Amino acid sequence: MRLFSYNDCNMIYEAKEFVLNNGLKVVLRSPEKEDAYNLINQIISVASSTDYLLSTPSDFQHYVDDISKEEAFIEWSKTDSGYWLIACVEDKIVANCSLRFYKHEKDRHRGTIGIAITEEYQSMGIGSLMFDEMIKLATNTPGVEQIELDVIDNNEKGLRLYKSKGFVETGKIPHQLKLKDGTYLNGLTMVLFLNK
């Protein structure tokens, strides 16, 4: 008996245009190698504006120093077990969202999702749109039964989005992140059980 492999799936998301409630046109698509510079700058911009992300701008410096590393990562993401979407407004990358599936026999029914939206584009519906698309992709991926995420417990915008999509709290992570000033942020784990 042959086990399912995610390599059997096309992990590329073809570009789709959406119109938000405010009339803004947003294109969702998989990133291309040519997006590397703009994508890394979007990630650094978000990491600079919030403490809610695991990463800091300095964590991405090696990509800035050698953009070919980011280009290679983008190419790798197309063949790995998951999806990576970017949201573009007039060709500007304003958000990115990743959905990765676990690979081991005992946990391949699980996926993990993360999102980063540029501050001035938050609360417009882009996160909701990206999560809707990722949930559809996960639902249509054979064997995937649940999507998980971690969130800082006082990230009200994030919690509102995740709960609206059906994610439920499953645990607490004390001192999940430690900031430069020595203070800690506590985290929550959440899961969405997919109805297939």
Regions found by a protein language model. Give the residues of each.
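Conserved acetyl-CoA-binding loop-helix of GNAT-fold acetyltransferases
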Residues: I115-I117, S123-A138, L159-S164
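Acetyl-CoA-dependent GNAT
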Residues: F60-E120, F193-N195
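A short gly/proline-enriched turn/hairpin at secondary-structure junctions
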Residues: T50-Q61
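Conserved GNAT acetyl-CoA-binding A-motif
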Residues: F131, A138-D150
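Terminal substrate-recognition subdomain of acyl/acetyltransferases
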Residues: R2-N22, I173, G182-K196
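Conserved beta-strand segments that form the floor/walls of ligand-binding pockets within enzyme
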Residues: I86, S98, T112-A116, G125, ...
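A short beta-loop-alpha structural element at the N-terminal edge
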Residues: V26-N41
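Conserved catalytic-core motifs of GNAT/GCN5-like acyltransferases
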Residues: Q146-V151, K163-T183
